[in-house]
């Protein structure tokens, strides 16, 4: 199947400006296409991945992706999908975010080779345009009536929208025009909320370059979970690509915990597995759901893609240790990842009796309860049961002098940081 057929099979196409024309174009030649992201933060989350996974598929099919980091538009604020004005960021913060997002993109895409990925920053071609040029050369080509009719603006008319955010669609249209004339970009990809901005770009190109210009837009559906909620959030909030914000273990666990009703859809959306392999896994979901093979494959594919093979192996190791209770096999760094969301306590490195220590930390409510739990075999330290109420807790019990793991009962883990 060609790239458009594959995208449609994967359920990744929402709207196209000219399906027949785009299909014919990609069958005739390899094209350049672009997708942009504004540096509103210093990391993307998994919701941002959706259009860039499509870009990656085009790249693997031999087409040339152009990734735009919005160093200019990021200082303005995209009103799409928002009910209120964005808080403007300083140029210094925007530049910091640009650098961080650029580094993330370089990890996700291969640079060099037959299908080289280009990174561009729209600040480079917009910062020297003065207000007169903006109004004469670009603003003249936009009708206020059509701008007001765009969903991204119409939805804000009751609550209010600033002139700054109102003109965002002009800036994004300028991006498409610039990339069309300078990089021969013929296709823009975006989320479903970007349809109005994308069509503004098509209109501008045709007005400035002629109606025969072959340019296209394609949007991706809003991805919802089976319960109707928006994809991309965990119980702890957004799932980030930055390992400092969401550890590779947490990232892996997010995908492992995918609902059976969603997992096949996610395999199509996010992985590069073949149709045959995904069909096999879909059968396993129906016939052997308890094995969660599809979820494990999804988690492995996504963790390796975003964080690399080594981080995947570490996440799998932590998962296995937590399931089996074999905590001693983990390193201190792995403990830090695996127990990040567990109840955490702080302790000195001073040697203490286990009973006194558990009560002082607040893990046990009283000495009597602590002794009772120890005598009943309900307390484990670093994966080994504590059977003697006279046991001393020393720094030698810790992982690299940093952590001690206490388990009370079967599942109640606590992380104790020494310092």
Swiss-Prot record:
Domain S4 RNA-binding: 352-418
Catalytic activity reported: tRNA(Tyr) + L-tyrosine + ATP = L-tyrosyl-tRNA(Tyr) + AMP + diphosphate + H(+)
Family: Belongs to the class-I aminoacyl-tRNA synthetase family. TyrS type 1 subfamily.
Subunit structure of this chain's protein: Homodimer.
UniProt EC number: 6.1.1.1
Chain positions recorded as ATP binding sites: 233
Keywords linked to the UniProt accession: Aminoacyl-tRNA synthetase, ATP-binding, Cytoplasm, Ligase, Nucleotide-binding, Protein biosynthesis, RNA-binding
Annotated GO MF terms: ATP binding; RNA binding; tyrosine-tRNA ligase activity
CDD domains: S4, TyrRS_core
Motif 'KMSKS' region: chain residues: 230-234
Root EC class: ligase
Protein known as: Tyrosine--tRNA ligase 2
Binding locations of L-tyrosine: 34, 168, 172
Example of a GO cellular component annotation carried by this entry: cytosol
GO biological process: tyrosyl-tRNA aminoacylation
Signal peptide: none
InterPro entries linked: aa-tRNA-synth_I_CS (IPR001412), aa-tRNA-synth_Ic (IPR002305), Rossmann-like_a/b/a_fold (IPR014729), S4_RNA-bd (IPR002942), S4_RNA-bd_sf (IPR036986), SYY-like_C (IPR054608), Tyr-tRNA-ligase (IPR002307), Tyr-tRNA-ligase_bac-type (IPR024088)
Pfam families the record matches: SYY_C-terminal (PF22421), tRNA-synt_1b (PF00579)
Compartment annotation: Cytoplasm
